[in-house]
Amino acid sequence: MSETDAAATLPADARDAFKSPIGPVYTDAAALLADATPPIIAVGDVVTYHLVDAGQTPAVAVVDGRTERDAVRPAVRDAIPEPDLTVASEPGTVSVSLVRALVDAIADADATVVSVDGEEDLAVVPAVLAAPADATVVYGQPGEGMVRVPVTDAGRAEMRERADRLETTAAFWRLVD
């Protein structure tokens, strides 16, 4: 299996399962940060922008230069720290290289920005599954705000249920477990 191969793919009949937020939704980054516990892992450009703007650089940020399929505004792009590495991941998938980069970034003591050539939307799944206990994963909910996912047994169990709706490979589970 190559690094660019899909470790997980979202089948069309499972898309609805991923539309509802998996945690509380915030429109104010300061309020979200008051409820968050480190390390903070951000999935999405606009989420990362709001956290940085509120004074909190995420331990890990996964970005793709897009929001809701459009390029992010220059102010958003310019506020996000330069990527430490770039990986490819096609829309509707999570590539082996993206999962590996995410797992490695979570283990790294330094803040890491992972840029995705393609789409990072599904990166929230391996982020929650691979994050340490009591971490916080934050992702964007289109039209609503930022979702805070506390990495607890319950949060992981709910994300594992969603992961079970994906078409996954053995490599996916090896990397996130």
UniProtKB/Swiss-Prot annotation:
Gene Ontology biological process terms, A to Z: coenzyme A biosynthetic process
UniProt KW keywords: Coenzyme A biosynthesis, GTP-binding, Kinase, Nucleotide-binding, Transferase
GO MF: GTP binding; kinase activity
Catalysed transformations (reactions): 3'-dephospho-CoA + GTP = GDP + CoA + H(+)
Pathway membership, UniProt: Cofactor biosynthesis; coenzyme A biosynthesis
Pfam families, per the entry: DUF359
Residues that coordinate or bind GTP: 45-47, 64, 120
Source taxon at top rank: Archaea
EC number, as in UniProt: 2.7.1.237
Family, similarity comment: Belongs to the GTP-dependent DPCK family.
HAMAP family: Dephospho_CoA_kinase_GTP_dep
Function of the protein: Catalyzes the GTP-dependent phosphorylation of the 3'-hydroxyl group of dephosphocoenzyme A to form coenzyme A (CoA).
Protein name: GTP-dependent dephospho-CoA kinase
